[in-house]
Amino acid sequence: MFPASTPHPCPHPYPPTAAKAGDGWRFGARGCRPEPPSFLPGYRQLMAAEYFDSYQRAQLMALLSRMGPRPVSSRDAAVQVNPRRDASVQCSLGRRTLQPGRRRASPDARPGSCQPRSPARAGRPPRSWRTVALYSPVTFGGLSSSLEVAGDRQTPTKGEGRPAPTGTREPEPGEVAVMKAVPQPQSEEGDVQAEGQDGQEQPPREDPDSVAAMQSEPGSEEPPPAVEMAQDPSDVAASRDRASPQSTEQDKERLRFQFLEQKYGYYHCKDCNIRWESAYVWCVQGTSKVYFKQFCRVCEKSYNPYRVEDITCQSCKRTRCACPVRLRHVDPKRPHRQDLCGRCKDKRLSCDSTFSFKYII
């Protein structure tokens, strides 16, 4: 009935029972071999070597997934390790799942490609090959480069505005406040830069037209500059109209990376008319936008503090107190108003609790 094969090198670790005899598995002196199922009469029988490989694979996957001592199905066992989907599997297996040699190198970084790029390809944004998990040491240039790629993808490349700046970087902690406080001068500077760059790019853009005009009319050499000068004001106006929304888009792209800082918040419940000072909240740097909410202890409704101020000393107005005579309740390293809230003292969740969030993307 069964094809001739070599004896199985490893007997089945689980003893055969009468209940399991009719479940599609036949146990004998030469080892275990699966029977063909009734609904698949032409199913090919597994050879001894194939069964041994699948059984070892099943044992390995049982150890990796830390399953119980139950018998593992030896028909097939596989785990999909994909950096786009199964991040949890990668975390359990370790960081060795993503090897540096498996990543494809960009065509610009190859040692043999030393030829200068054509002007058509010079304005293309850098390609991001695939999404790699952030915990892996193999990342595409880090978090800042991913923001650069996202910002460069939105900028047009065929003369529809100013090209992407070469030195794009992530904003410093103080730049978010500056960008939010003074958005108009940056847009005007962007318009001026776009106007200057458009003026520099216009001669090569008009070169094909002028060459075609010179080839069609070899005697007339003066009209092309006149036409170019006539088209300058409209092109400049159009470039201004195009550059202003692009500058706002780039500002929005930069503002996506928001640094957080701790501030002092006064909490107030309007429904219960209860007010208390609960010390530390996380705000976007330079603003009063709060990312941490609390619930009222009476009505349990969510609300935000109606007033947020910097964590500074009341007398010297500094983050680190520099007063000659310090009050007893003020910590020299953390000069907050620590005497206002007395209910959270010696509790697990108190006003002194801080959170590990540093930035929000």
Swiss-Prot record:
The modification Phosphothreonine is found at residue 155. Keywords: Cytoplasm, Developmental protein, Differentiation, Metal-binding, Oogenesis, Phosphoprotein, RNA-binding, Ubl conjugation, Zinc, Zinc-finger. A zinc finger (3CxxC-type) spans 263-346. The keyword 4Fe-4S does not apply. Interacts with YBX2. It comes from Rattus norvegicus (Rat). Residues 68-129, 142-252 are annotated as: Disordered. It is found in: Cytoplasm, Cytoplasmic ribonucleoprotein granule; Cytoplasm. GO terms for molecular function: molecular condensate scaffold activity; mRNA 3'-UTR binding; RNA sequestering activity; zinc ion binding. One of its GO terms (cellular component) is intracellular membraneless organelle. mRNA-binding protein that mediates formation of MARDO (mitochondria-associated ribonucleoprotein domain), a membraneless compartment that stores maternal mRNAs in oocytes. MARDO assembly around mitochondria is directed by an increase in mitochondrial membrane potential during oocyte growth. Promotes formation of MARDO phase-separated membraneless compartment by undergoing liquid-liquid phase separation upon binding to maternal mRNAs. Binds to the 3'-UTR of maternal mRNAs. Maternal mRNAs stored in the MARDO are translationally repressed. Pfam families: Zn_ribbon_3CxxC. InterPro entries: Zar1, ZAR1/RTP1-5-like_Znf-3CxxC. This is Zygote arrest protein 1.
